[in-house]
């Protein structure tokens, strides 16, 4: 694409790099520059610098550097055209009709179309919640004491399909959204008769959905498939709000209900993985904002196993980790409803060091009253 150099320079000069970078990672001023943990490689000590005078960034650890355009392209996985458009919009500068390659144009147009379809779907689900169709969903949210129920999907197999179709989108675009299943019988809504939770990225765009059954049924949770705008392993539910929290940690939990309950109780640093086991990408995403993570998974066997796995992933990412004890409740949602926010804050304050947690869980596998068992236990711990 071609944009006059003077217009590119104007867009650059009207987007302060410190503002752009600090909206995505935490920075601290040292001398005339700002420093933070590099978002492009794992490190424990801040070596990522941003110079307001030079309007440049540079990492002394990995060598990554550049201006506001290159930072946005690298961090948000954008093309130059997309980064230029985002910064122009932010500065209130109207771009002239520009030339993109066919591939760039098609990719950009498709991403924007899928964002628009997702936004329309979120509106539709919210609308249904206020109709007779949403009676059961409203009762469900009230029972769970959730004040911000976000929507409900229709009972029929093609409610959303016809709604989106009538908005002027074609089947090719709708298929790319992941909201519909196409087979020999035609098109069907992926989500039916479920309470719906829009998944919003750190740029506040709807990238997908999670749906939960209101009674019996499998799967209990159903998520959007991966699409051109939705990568499960590189996003976290609730991070769009948690990244702006004033807390110096992030709480990782299992489900949407846990996140919503925590946010309502004032713990707006809570996030959840998106129907998958925690990934390295999600750990690195968290690392962009904080150094400390509190693991708050379910207190049952699978939750304990998931906690142990998460501790290893966070450790490899260079994050400090503690574990919140939810017993005698199953999860944070149940705990907060039973004991309240103050009691939950006490559990946060008393969170267990991750190494001590690992040792305590490992201890269950050995008879420490038996010399051989005790020896085996200490050998295992020392590995």
Residue ranges and their predicted role:
Residues 1-101, 339, 346:
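N-terminal structured subdomain of primase-like DNA metabolism proteins
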Residues 11-14, 104-114, 131-134, 153-157, ...:
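Conserved phosphate/pyrophosphate-binding and hydrolysis machinery centered on Walker-type P-loop NTPases
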Residues 15, 30, 106-121, 139, ...:
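Phosphate-handling DNA/RNA-contact segment within nucleic-acid enzymes
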Residues 20, 67-71, 120-124, 136, ...:
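A general alpha-helix detector
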Residues 55-56, 89, 93, 101-102, ...:
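Short, conserved phosphate-binding/catalytic loop or strand-edge motifs used
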Residues 76, 244, 276-328, 335-348:
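Conserved catalytic cores of soluble enzyme domains
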Residues 82-136:
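Conserved active-site segments centered on acidic
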Residues 321-383:
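C-terminal or mid-to-C-terminal helical accessory/interaction module adjacent to the motor/catalytic core
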């Amino acid at each position: 694409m071609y944009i006059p150099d003077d217009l590119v320079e104007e867009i650059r000069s009207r987007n302060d790099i410190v503002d752009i970078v600090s909206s995505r990672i935490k920075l601290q001023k040292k001398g005339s520059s700002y420093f933070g943990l590099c978002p492009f490689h794992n490190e424990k000590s801040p070596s990522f610098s941003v110079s307001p005078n030079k309007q440049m960034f540079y990492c002394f650890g990995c060598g990554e550097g550049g201006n506001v355009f290159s930072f946005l392209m690298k961090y948000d996985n954008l093309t130059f055209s997309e980064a230029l458009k985002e910064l122009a919009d932010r500065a209130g500068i109207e771009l002239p009709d520009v030339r993109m390659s066919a591939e760039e144009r098609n990719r950009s147009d498709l991403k924007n179309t899928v964002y628009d379809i997702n936004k329309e779907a979120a509106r539709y689900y919210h609308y249904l919640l206020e109709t007779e169709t949403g009676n059961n969903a409203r009762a469900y949210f009230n029972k769970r004491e959730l004040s911000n129920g976000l929507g409900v999907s229709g009972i029929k197999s093609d409610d959303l399909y016809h709604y989106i179709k009538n908005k002027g989108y074609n089947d090719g675009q709708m298929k790319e959204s992941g909201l519909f299943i196409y087979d020999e019988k035609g098109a069907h809504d992926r989500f039916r008769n479920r309470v719906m939770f829009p998944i919003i990225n750190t740029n506040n765009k709807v990238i997908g959905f999670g749906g939960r059954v209101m009674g019996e049924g499998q799967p209990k949770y159903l998520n959007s498939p991966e699409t051109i705008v939705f990568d499960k392993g590189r996003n976290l539910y609730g991070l769009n709000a948690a990244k702006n929290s004033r807390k110096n940690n992030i709480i990782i939990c299992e489900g949407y209900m846990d996140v919503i309950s925590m946010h309502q109780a004032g713990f707006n640093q809570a996030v959840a993985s998106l129907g998958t086991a925690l990934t390295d990408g999600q750990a690195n995403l968290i690392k962009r904002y904080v150094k400390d993570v509190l693991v708050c998974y379910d207190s049952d066997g699978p939750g304990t196993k998931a906690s142990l796995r998460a501790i290893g992933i966070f450790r490899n990412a260079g994050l400090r980790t503690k574990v919140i004890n939810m017993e005698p409740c199953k999860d944070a949602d149940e705990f907060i409803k039973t004991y309240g926010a103050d009691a939950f804050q006490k559990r946060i304050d008393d969170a267990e060091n991750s190494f001590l947690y690992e040792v305590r869980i490992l201890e269950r596998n050995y008879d420490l009253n038996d010399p051989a068992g005790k020896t085996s236990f200490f050998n295992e711990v020392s590995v």
